[in-house]
Amino acid sequence: MSPEITPGHIGLSVTNLDRSLAFYQDVLELEVLQRFDDAGRRFAFLGAGGRLFLTLWQQSDAGYEPRHAGLHHLAFQVPTLEDVQTAEAKLRARGQMPRYDGVVPHREGAESAALFFTDPDGIRLEIYSPTGAAGLRAPVAGAPSCGFF
């Protein structure tokens, strides 16, 4: 295996493609690269700058169950704390409250700042900036904030 292996894309099963597309386009500002609605198969490819990194597949009858083995959470990195705060404002405008009541550091004393929330199917998401958390208090002592939301 090549030492240059990197993640290609993440595929998520969703219960309602239209609702999920609206969420990911609005909150994370992802663009729809392709969408398919034929023969009972509904799915879409999303990304940024023309680069694919998220696929949505309408194949689920029920929301995400965090107590089952599998995906813990999906994290998206943005350049600045302001980008994280923009996502928070969009999330709140949709009537959805983030975990921890807003942007927090990954752990006490960390420079990285994150927002933790769920998508319409309950899939746990994180959007973070590598810098900008100086002076913010971590919500969880002795463990990463991303581990227990």
Description of each model-found segment:
Residues 1-18, 71-74, 131-149:
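N-terminal beta-strand motif that seeds the catalytic metal site of vicinal oxygen chelate
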Residues 2, 13-54, 58:
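Core segments of cupin and vicinal oxygen chelate
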Residues 14-18, 75-124, 149:
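Vicinal oxygen chelate
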Residues 40, 70, 111:
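Exposed loop/turn and edge beta-strand positions of beta-sandwich/beta-sheet ligand-binding modules
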Residues 49-51, 68-71:
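Short connector loops at helix/strand junctions that flank enzyme active sites
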Residues 59-64:
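Short beta-strand/turn micro-motifs at beta-sheet edges
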Residues 108-109, 127-134:
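Short beta->alpha transition motifs characteristic of CBS
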